[in-house]
């Protein structure tokens, strides 16, 4: 599970860093030199740390109750954020919860591969207009994308159609 966490963080950083670097090169205006790195760090936080707003709501609610009634702040309920629909058993897990509790399911294992597929697709889009691109330099990225999307079929088939469409569009 720690390896999947690290691969997910690295994938999120890489995809967003690559995208913002490309926008910085192509777009008008001035971007700070640290802009792509900052965007990558924000992406890591958003993908692997931040989840739904249930945790934030719980903290605010418990703090408000402590301030207004003088009661002590109860311990944080990690499970509450994974079941957000009152009166129902709808599971609303998010990556941090899944990593925290080592809930090793296909949707967790697939996250680094979905980011890899997104990154490889982005690479194809960003390099498609380069003059030096020929069939030899395109075979490796296309092969890697095909292998990654094919692996998603085995890892978590629910992700396969989405990333197949993304790969075809790229």
Protein language model features and the residues they cover:
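Loop-to-helix entry region of an early transmembrane alpha helix in multi-pass inner-membrane enzymes
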Residues: 1-7, 100-113
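Aromatic-rich transmembrane-lumenal/periplasmic boundary elements in polytopic membrane proteins
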Residues: 34-100
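Short hydrophobic alpha-helices at membrane interfaces in multi-pass membrane enzymes
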Residues: 128-149
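Membrane-interface alpha helices of multi-pass inner-membrane proteins
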Residues: 98-101, 142-155
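Start-transfer (signal-anchor) and selected internal transmembrane alpha helices
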Residues: 20, 26-45, 139-140
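Transmembrane-helix motifs of polytopic, lipid-linked glycan transferases
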Residues: 2-24, 114-120
């Amino acid at each position: 599970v720690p390896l999947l966490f690290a691969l997910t963080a690295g994938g999120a950083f890489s995809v967003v860093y690559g995208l913002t670097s490309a926008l910085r090169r192509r777009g008008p205006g001035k971007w700070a030199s640290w802009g792509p790195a900052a965007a990558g760090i924000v992406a890591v936080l958003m993908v692997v740390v931040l989840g739904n707003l249930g945790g934030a709501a719980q903290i605010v609610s418990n703090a408000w109750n402590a301030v207004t009634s003088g009661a002590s702040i109860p311990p944080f309920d990690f499970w509450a954020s994974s079941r957000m629909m009152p009166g129902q058993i709808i599971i609303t897990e998010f990556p941090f919860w899944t990593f925290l509790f080592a809930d090793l399911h296909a949707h967790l294992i697939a996250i680094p591969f979905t980011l890899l597929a997104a990154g490889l697709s982005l690479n194809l889009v960003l390099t498609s207009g380069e003059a030096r691109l020929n069939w030899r330099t395109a075979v490796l990225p296309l092969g890697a994308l095909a292998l990654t999307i094919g692996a998603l079929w085995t890892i978590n088939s629910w992700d396969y159609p989405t990333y197949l469409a993304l790969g075809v569009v790229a």
